[in-house]
Amino acid sequence: MKPPIILINYKAYENSYGEKGVEISKKIEKVSKDYGVPIIISVPATMIYKLSQILEIPVYAQHVDALRHGAHTGAILPEMIKDAGAKGSLLNHSERKIRLDEIHEAVTRIRDLGLESVVCADSYELVHPLALLKPNAILIEPPELIGSGRAVSKEKPEVITRAVNEIKKVEGVYLIAGAGITTGEDVYKAIELGADGIGVASAVMKSSTPEKIVEDFIINALKAIDRKK
């Protein structure tokens, strides 16, 4: 994982699985290769194996359970996603929150398996304590802006700048900004404010031309990073 980080959460949209899931993933990977920017896709558990077999970009799970092998019906263990080909997992998304002790256990297990973790935080106050668990990145997402089309980088830029100040207290953990990211301008602003990348879902998954959206994101991310040099 290295900046600019672009993480696309497929959630459970109609085009997140099956042949539609394969189709959108291939489009995303093509743009990723065209610009030399690895894009992380966080996909439904049922798609991890299929997509990891045909793609070179990192495939993540959307969630894992902090449980050991045993009688846990319906559980998704870190070992399971590794076996399926995942390179990492999202954790603690606003739509799939878990307790702090569960986050700690999951991050540790994921790291021990040689995988990556991105832990979501719904406020900048949580960035530092979550970063102390040493995931690869923290994804800051004010829940009220998720899926709203109103970008955190425009609506609440102070959330990003404060999160940046918190992440600097812990070495080796990236900060990703998400919630409402819709345009390349939103991406540029987020990185200008100090984020290492962006997280996005509906802007890509609901688009009729997802490859154009992703290309716009990459162009502006690279432009923002170049401007900061």
From Swiss-Prot:
Q: What is its EC number?
A: 5.3.1.1
Q: What compartments host this protein?
A: Cytoplasm
Reactions catalysed: D-glyceraldehyde 3-phosphate = dihydroxyacetone phosphate
Q: In which pathway does it act?
A: Carbohydrate biosynthesis; gluconeogenesis; Carbohydrate degradation; glycolysis; D-glyceraldehyde 3-phosphate from glycerone phosphate: step 1/1
Domain of life according to the entry: Archaea
Binding of substrate, residues: N9, Y10, K11, I146, G180, A201, S202
Gene3D superfamilies in UniProt: Aldolase class I
List the catalytic residues. H93 (electrophile), E141 (proton acceptor)
Q: Name one GO molecular function term.
A: triose-phosphate isomerase activity
- Top-level EC class as recorded in UniProt: isomerase
Keyword flag Lipid metabolism = no
* Signal peptide coordinates: none
Q: Which PROSITE patterns match?
A: TIM_2
GO cellular component terms, alphabetically, are: cytosol
Keywords carried by this UniProt record: Cytoplasm, Gluconeogenesis, Glycolysis, Isomerase
Q: Which InterPro entries match?
A: Aldolase_TIM (IPR013785), TIM_sf (IPR035990), Triosephosphate_isomerase (IPR000652), Triosephosphate_isomerase_arc (IPR022891)
- Single GO biological process annotation from the record: glyceraldehyde-3-phosphate biosynthetic process
Q: How does it assemble?
A: Homotetramer; dimer of dimers.
> Which NCBIfam families does its entry note?
PRK04302.1, tim
**Family classification:** Belongs to the triosephosphate isomerase family.
What HAMAP family does the record point to? Answer: TIM_A (MF_00147_A)
**What is known about what this protein does?**
Involved in the gluconeogenesis. Catalyzes stereospecifically the conversion of dihydroxyacetone phosphate (DHAP) to D-glyceraldehyde-3-phosphate (G3P).
Recorded protein name is Triosephosphate isomerase
What is the native source organism of this protein?
Sulfurisphaera tokodaii (strain DSM 16993 / JCM 10545 / NBRC 100140 / 7) (Sulfolobus tokodaii)
The gene name reads tpiA
